[in-house]
Design a protein with these regions (language model features):
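Short beta-strand-loop-alpha-helix junction that forms the active-site gateway
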Residues: 55-77
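Non-catalytic C-terminal interaction segments of nucleic acid-processing enzymes
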Residues: 25, 95-146
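Short acidic/glycine-enriched loop/turn segments that link adjacent beta-strands
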Residues: 35-39, 96-98
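Short, surface-exposed beta-edge/turn micro-motifs
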Residues: 84-89, 96-98
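Acidic-basic catalytic patches of nuclease active cores, encompassing PD-(D/E)XK
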Residues: 1-35
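Conserved catalytic cores of phosphodiester-cleaving nucleases, focusing on short active-site segments
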Residues: 23, 41-62
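Short connector loops at helix/strand junctions that flank enzyme active sites
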Residues: 36-38, 49-53, 83-87
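Short amphipathic alpha-helical segments and helix-helix/interface helices
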Residues: 20, 79-80
Length: 146
């Protein structure tokens, strides 16, 4: 699947800033990953290091698990390359600033893997996703996230 640079340049800084603010309000010290092509951020809280990947989704607004319109949450397969490093995968809704999170060891299971042809928003071609039942995700309402 084609990487959409314009979307990345707009949404990556926003996602990192929102997630950083959220984590800092919860007592984490947050740092950018010095590896530009690695997992986005890491945080330290109570001497525990946690890794965070963040993505911003556009066009399908949600605020809670109940109004999330699908039974599963779709996670990009290209992030599987980091599966040996346990990390939290955070998706932020652009329209509402709600967020959802799931741990990588839950996401990247073969039973959730799905291939699909995509043709939208500058993306065209076959891509692989991991579709995780939303009950395995943590949903954070906008009032608690921003």
């Amino acid at each position: 699947m084609k990487f959409v640079k314009e979307s990345f340049e707009t949404n990556d800084p926003l996602g990192k800033a929102l997630l950083t603010d959220y984590l800092e309000r919860r007592g984490h010290d947050v740092y950018p990953n010095p590896d530009r092509y690695g997992i986005d951020l890491y945080s330290i809280k109570e001497d525990k290091k946690l890794w965070w990947e963040v993505e911003v989704k556009i066009g399908r607004p949600w605020t809670t698990m109940e109004d999330f319109q699908f039974p599963t949450v779709s996670f990009l397969s290209r992030k599987k390359k980091w599966e040996d490093t346990d990390f939290w995968y955070c998706i932020i809704c652009s329209e509402t600033r709600a967020a959802l999170m799931c741990f990588s060891s839950i996401i990247f299971q073969e039973e959730y893997r799905e291939e699909k042809y995509i043709n939208k928003g500058g993306r065209r071609g076959k891509d692989t996703f991991y579709r995780v039942p939303k009950k395995y995700c943590i949903f954070v309402q906008p009032k608690d996230f921003i």
